[in-house]
């Protein structure tokens, strides 16, 4: 009984409930809730990241300078038919630095991770601004790392 009393009167933080039984009263199977489900932070290989493109999986992850951001709530920009859809499931660093949305600036999952060491100061500044935008708007959920034997 004390659990219910604490729940109703503030003793339990519902955001920390591992059972998923508390919350805003919405069902956990509600499709509108899928984009807000928490994602466990971790390491992503480019191959793994490529699955989170809004097509193969509802979630949309984008990497910038080795950090992976959950951009699912920006689906209108990064999802299918969005203006930045080419970045979904990829390392978008070079494309953002060059202000280019062409596929030829995005590496495939089986290519080495782009070191970005040939960018000009202006391109680095542009990438800095984009990264700040992502850091302020989307949760960082992990790190992009090379897959042994693949991205080397």
Swiss-Prot record:
Q: List where Polar residues composition bias occurs.
A: 24-35
Q: Which Gene3D superfamilies match?
A: Cytochrome b5-like heme/steroid binding domain (3.10.120.10)
The Cytochrome b5 heme-binding domain extends over 46-145
The family database entries (InterPro entries) matched by this protein are listed as: Cyt_B5-like_heme/steroid-bd, Cyt_B5-like_heme/steroid_sf, MAPR/NEUFC/NENF-like
One protein family per Pfam = Cyt-b5
Protein family (similarity comment): Belongs to the cytochrome b5 family. MAPR subfamily.
Q: What is this protein called?
A: Damage response protein 1
The entry lists its GO molecular-function terms as: heme binding
Q: Which GO terms describe its cellular component?
A: endomembrane system; endosome; membrane
Q: Identify the species of origin.
A: Saccharomyces cerevisiae (strain ATCC 204508 / S288c)
Record note on domains: The cytochrome b5 heme-binding domain lacks the conserved iron-binding His residues at positions 81 and 105.
Biological process (GO), any one: regulation of ergosterol biosynthetic process
The record makes one more remark, namely: Present with 6300 molecules/cell in log phase SD medium.
- List, alphabetically, the PANTHER family matched: CALCUTTA CUP-RELATED, MEMBRANE-ASSOCIATED PROGESTERONE RECEPTOR COMPONENT-RELATED
Task: Give the span(s) annotated as Disordered.
Answer: 18-37
């Amino acid at each position: 009984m004390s659990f219910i009393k604490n729940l109703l009167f503030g003793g339990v933080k519902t955001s920390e409930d591992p059972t998923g039984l508390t919350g805003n009263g919405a069902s956990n199977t509600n499709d509108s809730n899928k984009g807000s489900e928490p994602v466990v932070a971790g390491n992503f290989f480019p191959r793994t990241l490529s699955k989170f493109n809004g097509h193969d999986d509802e979630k949309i992850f984008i990497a910038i300078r080795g950090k992976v951001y959950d951009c699912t709530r920006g689906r209108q920009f990064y999802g299918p038919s969005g203006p930045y859809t080419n970045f979904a499931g990829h390392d978008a660093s070079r494309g953002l630095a060059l202000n280019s949305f062409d596929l030829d600036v995005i590496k495939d999952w089986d290519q080495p991770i782009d070191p970005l060491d040939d960018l000009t100061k202006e391109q680095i500044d542009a990438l800095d601004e984009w990264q700040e935008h992502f850091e302020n708007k989307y949760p960082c959920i992990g790190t992009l790392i090379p897959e042994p034997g693949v991205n080397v």
